[in-house]
C-alpha cells in the first residue's frame, strides 16, 4: 500500500491472500457496536442468498471506535467462505476516508461490484444486497437507494441535495446522499482517481460527490426501492450543522467542476427514474425536530452573518433580514421560490469568491435552518406521504428558477 492509501499496511497480507473477488460489501463506522453486527450478518445472508456462486468480502472501515465496533463486526455471523476485513482507516477522520478505504480494497480485489451499507441501519434486509448489487452485475454503473423515510428525516436531501441535483442535471435521484449504494468496478476507479480526498469529500461530502460524479461521468444509473429506512436519525437542529456545511460545499464544488454538464440549453443528466410509492399506512417512526432552536438559529444567524449575506444576496439580503425579524414564528422561513433563489445566489457567490467560501457556507446554515423550520410547521398535520408533495414543490421551484442561475453564472 502506498503513502496516500487509507488502508493500513498490516491489512495487505489478507488482501494479497484473497487475491480477487466478485463482490465487496463495505460498512463505514464510528462507534456503531450496537448495530454493525446486525448489518454485517444480514449482508452476509443476502450475499449468499442472492449471489451463491460469487466471491464475497465484507469490509469494515472504522473511524477509531472505542465501543468495540470492529470486534462486533469480526464476530458477526457469516458463512465460512465469506472473508471479513476490519481496520481503522488512515487519513482525515470522516465517512469519505472510510469509503476511500473500502474502494481501495474493492479495486485491489478487482471486485465487479461494491456495495456500501450504513452501519447504523436497523431495517436492512438480505434483499438490499441484491437490489444494490444486482443492477451492477447487469451493467449499471451506480445504484442509488430510494427509501420510505419520515417527513423530517433527510432534511438536507429534501431541501437542497435532491432539488438542486434534479434541477441541474435532470436526474430524479431521490436520495443523492442516501448512504447505501452500489458501485461498478469502473466507477470505483473513477472515484479513486479524483483529487478530492483531502477536501470535505473525506467527510460527509462523499455521498453527493459520488452521486454527482456518477451522473456526470458514468453510464447507466439505477435506483433501488429499499422500503423503510430505520437508522439513528438526527435532529437537524442539534446535529446536522457540520454535515450541512460539508455536503453543500461539496455540492457547490461539483457544480463548478461539472458546469459543462449542467449549464447547457437542455439538461444532459440521467433520465428520470421511478421513485418509491408510499402507502398511507407506511408511516415511518417519527424524527424529533426542535423547531424553536431552528428558528433561533435563523434569527441569530442572519444578524451574525450580515456581511456574508450581503456578499451573496446583494440587495435581496434586506428581504431575508425582514423575514428573520418577523414577530411571528409562523412567518419565519423562506418560500420555495425564495429558497431556490437563495441557494443559487450562494452557489454563484461561492464560485466567484474563493477566499470567502467558508464564511459563505456558514452564512447559509441559518437560512437552511429557517427553511427547515418553516417546512416542519407547514407539514405539521401531514403524513410523510402527503409531505412528499412539499418536496416536489421545492424541486419545481429549483427547476423553474434555473434560468436565474444561468444568468448568475455568466
Residue ranges and their predicted role:
Residues 110-122:
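Short beta-strand-to-loop acidic/aromatic patch adjacent to the donor-nucleotide binding site
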Residues 245-410:
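Terminal low-complexity segments of carbohydrate-biosynthetic enzymes
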Residues 153-250:
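Conserved catalytic loops of nucleotide-sugar-dependent glycosyltransferases that act on lipid-linked
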Residues 1-45, 410:
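N-proximal low-complexity "stem/linker" segments adjacent to membrane-targeting elements
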Residues 27, 52-65:
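Short beta-strand/loop segment that forms part of the nucleotide-sugar
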Residues 61-71, 121:
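A conserved acidic beta->alpha catalytic loop
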Residues 59, 70-97, 108:
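Conserved donor nucleotide-binding strand/loop of the catalytic core
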Amino acid at each position: 500500500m502506498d503513502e496516500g492509501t487509507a488502508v493500513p499496511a498490516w491489512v495487505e497480507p489478507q488482501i494479497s491472500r484473497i487475491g480477487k473477488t466478485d463482490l465487496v460489501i463495505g460498512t463505514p463506522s464510528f462507534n456503531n457496536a450496537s448495530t454493525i453486527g446486525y448489518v454485517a450478518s444480514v449482508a452476509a445472508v443476502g450475499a449468499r442468498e442472492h449471489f451463491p456462486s460469487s466471491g464475497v468480502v465484507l469490509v469494515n472501515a472504522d473511524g477509531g471506535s472505542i465501543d468495540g465496533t470492529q470486534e462486533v463486526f469480526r464476530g458477526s455471523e457469516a458463512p465460512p467462505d465469506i472473508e471479513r476485513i476490519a481496520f481503522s482507516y488512515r487519513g482525515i477522520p470522516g465517512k469519505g476516508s472510510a469509503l476511500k478505504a473500502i474502494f481501495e480494497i474493492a479495486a485491489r480485489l478487482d471486485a465487479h461490484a461494491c456495495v456500501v451499507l450504513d452501519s447504523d441501519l436497523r431495517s436492512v434486509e438480505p434483499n438490499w444486497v441484491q437490489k444494490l448489487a444486482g443492477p451492477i452485475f447487469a451493467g449499471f454503473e451506480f445504484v442509488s437507494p430510494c427509501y420510505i423515510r419520515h417527513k423530517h428525516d433527510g432534511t438536507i436531501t429534501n431541501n437542497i441535495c435532491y432539488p438542486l441535483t434534479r434541477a441541474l442535471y435532470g436526474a430524479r435521484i431521490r436520495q443523492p446522499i442516501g448512504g447505501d449504494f452500489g458501485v461498478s468496478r469502473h466507477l470505483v476507479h473513477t472515484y479513486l482517481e479524483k483529487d478530492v480526498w483531502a477536501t470535505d469529500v473525506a467527510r460527509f461530502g462523499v455521498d453527493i460527490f459520488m452521486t454527482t460524479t456518477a451522473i456526470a461521468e458514468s453510464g447507466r444509473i439505477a435506483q433501488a426501492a429499499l422500503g423503510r429506512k430505520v437508522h439513528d436519525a438526527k435532529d437537524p437542529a442539534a446535529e446536522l450543522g457540520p454535515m450541512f456545511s460539508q455536503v453543500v460545499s461539496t455540492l457547490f464544488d461539483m457544480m463548478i467542476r461539472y458546469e459543462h454538464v449542467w449549464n447547457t440549453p437542455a439538461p444532459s443528466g440521467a433520465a428520470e427514474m421511478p421513485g418509491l410509492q408510499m402507502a398511507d399506512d407506511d408511516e415511518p417512526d417519527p424524527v424529533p425536530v426542535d423547531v424553536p432552536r431552528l428558528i433561533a438559529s435563523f434569527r441569530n444567524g442572519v444578524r451574525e452573518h450580515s456581511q456574508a449575506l450581503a456578499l451573496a444576496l446583494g440587495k435581496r439580503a434586506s428581504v431575508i433580514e425582514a423575514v428573520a425579524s418577523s414577530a411571528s414564528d409562523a412567518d419565519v422561513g423562506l418560500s420555495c421560490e425564495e429558497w431556490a433563489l437563495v441557494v443559487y445566489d450562494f452557489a454563484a457567490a461561492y464560485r466567484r469568491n474563493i477566499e470567502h467560501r467558508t464564511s459563505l457556507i456558514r452564512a447559509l446554515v441559518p437560512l437552511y435552518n429557517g427553511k427547515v423550520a418553516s417546512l416542519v410547521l407547514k407539514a405539521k398535520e401531514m403524513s410523510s406521504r402527503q409531505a412528499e408533495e412539499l418536496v416536489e414543490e421545492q424541486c419545481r421551484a429549483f427547476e423553474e428558477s434555473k434560468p436565474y442561475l444561468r444568468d448568475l453564472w455568466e
